[in-house]
């Protein structure tokens, strides 16, 4: 710290003057001591302060020094204040005192001002505190692939959809129904870069898009033509049904019991949901090959989906394509499609009956369990082999197709207002009735013959009203013509 120079004037402040006198007096005595030792001389200091107090310093005995002083006739050098000031002015110091060894102890008005300014600055710094962290505002577009061991949570069906992010996040944060062991955030997933959700088994992770930034079709957004693709986010479907027109359309189905999870109390914690977009987006993490579909360039082309959760309402899942390289432990033939009417309720497949039911009733669960059979476990390896030599839609024109649809709902969709016929085959025991369980997961398979069959059909059931899914409204000839079905099936499989 450099020594400061002060103006040599009388200090007006009494306290400051007293402090300065004490420190400078000691400094003067210290200088006299140094001079007496260094130069072998006798020094006597006599000081009277403003209150007439006497302070003295003598290098030896004061009386001896004073006696010598009185005997001395003419001093060799005698100086006063005016002489010192004149000498300093000649040296160019302009009346300012040279820095002393103890000048930093000086408490002049100028030093007091500086000390007060330093105190104010330090108080300002201390009160301001450390610089805060930047605010944690995560308003970003994210894609959250979640490998969920449990089923997809079914939020309150009567609640309205505030925002897609809110619905997806509320579904993901419900730890009682969904506990994701692996959660990966991908910021701003570009449509051009294919992504894969993480996988731990034969079925991949559930794809949950909070802001619907998911590759779809030819690289377009799921909201490509102004309509929300409800199939892109299973959380939105599970929360409010198919929000197919971008409006708030809460489902009228009663919420499933047991926290809204269909058959949750009796399921294994190994269920997986794979809902990737179409061929140019994400593919399931199974051993699947890319499907080049003719419908892949449409913004609302239905994706390649393997849904194994019962809480997805069917109106948002109208399937038009299946992957071609699933595990071929079981293959589905056209003769097995006639037995699908037995699988019409999620309560039919309890976990105690899954294994035996898969082995002995394979024809009943082959297509429906892969598409909407939420009760099937991960290791069941049910698959669909849609190679060119097998045509799924090669059943007869109308009657077996009626039997193929689940027990009453799909028949009513085709016949508009006709009462449903009784199911031709006995059903496995149901733990809960259909009215308590809400929509059956098989009802999500709207027709399997067209990717848009469920769009213009009227649901005459009183307990559920299906919202309209955006699609191409087919006419009656397109529904009933087997050639049209085969042409569509050939367009699916490549």
Swiss-Prot record:
Residues 454-464, 475-494 have a biased composition (Basic and acidic residues). Binds DNA as a homo- or heterodimer. Dimerizes with MEF2D. Interacts with HDAC7. Interacts with PIAS1; the interaction enhances sumoylation. Interacts with HDAC4, HDAC9 and SLC2A4RG. Interacts (via the N-terminal) with MAPK7; the interaction results in the phosphorylation and transcriptional activity of MEF2A. One of its GO terms (cellular component) is nucleus. Residues 3-57 form the MADS-box domain. It comes from the Eukaryota. GO terms for biological process: apoptotic process; cardiac conduction; cellular response to calcium ion; dendrite morphogenesis; ERK5 cascade; MAPK cascade; mitochondrial genome maintenance; mitochondrion distribution. There is a cross-link at residue 393 (Glycyl lysine isopeptide (Lys-Gly) (interchain with G-Cter in SUMO)). Residues 171-181, 440-453 have a biased composition (Low complexity). The gene is MEF2A. The modification Phosphothreonine is found at residues 302, 309, 405. This is Myocyte-specific enhancer factor 2A. SMART domains: MADS. The record marks 174-175, 211-212, 453-454 as: Cleavage. PROSITE patterns: MADS_BOX_1, MADS_BOX_2. Transmembrane segments: none annotated. Residues 264-281 are annotated as: Required for interaction with MAPKs. GO terms for molecular function: chromatin binding; DNA-binding transcription factor activity, RNA polymerase II-specific; DNA-binding transcription factor binding; histone acetyltransferase binding; histone deacetylase binding; protein dimerization activity; RNA polymerase II cis-regulatory region sequence-specific DNA binding; RNA polymerase II transcription regulatory region sequence-specific DNA binding. Residues 58-86 bind DNA. Its main location: nucleus. Residues 171-218, 238-268, 380-494 are annotated as: Disordered. It comes from Pongo abelii.
């Amino acid at each position: 710290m450099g020594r400061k120079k002060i103006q040599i004037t009388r200090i007006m402040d009494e306290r400051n003057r007293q402090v300065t006198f004490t420190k400078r007096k000691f400094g003067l005595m210290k200088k006299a001591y140094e001079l007496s030792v260094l130069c072998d001389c006798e020094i006597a200091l006599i000081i009277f302060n403003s209150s007439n107090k006497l302070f003295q310093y003598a290098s030896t005995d004061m009386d001896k020094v004073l006696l010598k002083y009185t005997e001395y006739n003419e001093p060799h050098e005698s100086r006063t204040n005016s002489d010192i000031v004149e000498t300093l002015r000649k040296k160019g110091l302009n009346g300012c005192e040279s820095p002393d060894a103890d000048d930093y102890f000086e408490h002049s008005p100028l030093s007091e001002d500086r000390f007060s300014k330093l105190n104010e600055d330090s108080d300002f710094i201390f009160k301001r505190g450390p610089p805060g962290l930047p605010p944690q505002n995560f308003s970003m577009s994210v894609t959250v692939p979640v490998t969920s061991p449990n089923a997809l949570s079914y939020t309150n069906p009567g609640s309205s959809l505030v925002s897609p992010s809110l619905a997806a996040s509320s579904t993901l944060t419900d730890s009682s129904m969904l506990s994701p062991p692996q959660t990966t955030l991908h910021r701003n997933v570009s449509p051009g870069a294919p992504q894969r959700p993480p996988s731990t088994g034969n079925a991949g992770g559930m794809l949950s898009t909070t802001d619907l930034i998911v590759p779809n079709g030819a690289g377009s957004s799921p909201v490509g033509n102004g309509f929300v693709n409800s199939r892109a986010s299973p959380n939105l479907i599970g929360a409010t049904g198919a929000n197919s027109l971008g409006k708030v359309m809460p489902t009228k189905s009663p919420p499933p019991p047991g926290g809204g999870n269909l058959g949750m109390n009796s399921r294994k914690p190994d269920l997986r949901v794979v809902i990737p977009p179409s061929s140019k987006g994400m593919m399931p993490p199974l051993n699947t090959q890319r499907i080049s579909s003719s419908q892949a360039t449409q913004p609302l082309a239905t994706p390649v989906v393997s849904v194994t959760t019962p809480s997805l309402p069917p109106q948002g899942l109208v399937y038009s394509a299946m992957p071609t390289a699933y595990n071929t432990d079981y293959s589905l033939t056209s003769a097995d499609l006639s037995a699908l009417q037995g699988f019409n309720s999620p309560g039919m497949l309890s976990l105690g009956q899954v294994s035996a039911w898969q082995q002995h009733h394979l024809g009943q669960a082959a297509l429906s369990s892969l598409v909407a059979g939420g009760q099937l476990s991960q290791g069941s390896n049910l698959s669909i082999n849609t190679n060119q030599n097998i045509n799924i839609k090669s059943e007869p024109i109308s009657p077996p197709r009626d039997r193929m649809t689940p027990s009453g709902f799909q028949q009513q969709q085709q016949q508009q207002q006709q009462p449903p016929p009784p199911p031709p085959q006995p059903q496995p025991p149901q733990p809960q009735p259909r009215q308590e369980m809400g929509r059956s997961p098989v009802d999500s398979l709207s027709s399997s013959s067209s990717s848009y069959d469920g769009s213009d059909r009227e649901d005459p059931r009183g307990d559920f009203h299906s919202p309209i899914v955006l699609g191409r409204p087919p006419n009656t000839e397109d529904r009933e013509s087997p050639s049209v079905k085969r042409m569509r099936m050939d367009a699916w499989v490549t």
